[in-house]
A protein has these predicted regions:
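Nucleotide/phosphate-binding catalytic cleft detector across ATP-hydrolyzing
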Residues: 1-153
Length: 154
């Protein structure tokens, strides 16, 4: 991976972004605060979550991911764009991005993830099944012909 390439774990409750040589550079809740009157996003992540229950009725908290897949395409794109732009500066080459997705994701859902990440400024997008990413992240050599079990306790 090049220095500005990033990996994204698009979780239902949390988005984590890691960068080569730096480790985790962003860990934020998967939520946006939207002004429903103006149809504009006010905040994302921690700042949006802090607004829950403390704002007028016309400001809604939207959790755009359900079961690890996109349920609100527009809000997911906004969330990813904001977070990717926080991680890399505009003078850098556009990053290649690896995104963890559920193994059972449909073609339409995977297309939506790729489109959202490209809209955020990615040069190339690679989708990696979550079990494969978990195995690689825990140091398992997935090229070896041996059985391993990975349990997701979340």
């Amino acid at each position: 991976m090049a220095q500005n390439d990033i990996g994204i774990d698009l979780g239902t409750t949390t988005i984590i972004i890691a960068q080569e040589g730096k480790g985790v550079v962003l860990n934020q809740p998967s939520v946006v605060a939207m002004d429903t009157r103006k149809k504009t996003v006010l905040e994302a992540g921690d700042k949006a979550l802090a607004m829950v229950g403390r704002t007028p009725n016309y400001i809604s908290a939207i959790f755009p991911l359900k079961d690890g897949v996109i349920s609100d395409h527009t809000m997911t794109r906004e969330l990813i764009c904001r977070f990717v732009k926080q991680v890399y500066s505009s003078h850098m080459v556009k990053p290649r991005v690896a995104v963890c997705v559920p193994a059972a994701i449909t073609g339409i859902e995977s297309d939506a993830v790729v489109e959202a990440v490209v809209a955020a400024g990615a040069r190339q997008v690679y989708l990696i099944d979550e079990p494969i990413a978990a195995a690689l992240g825990s140091g398992i050599d997935i090229t070896q012909p041996e059985g391993r079990m990975i349990i997701d306790l979340s």
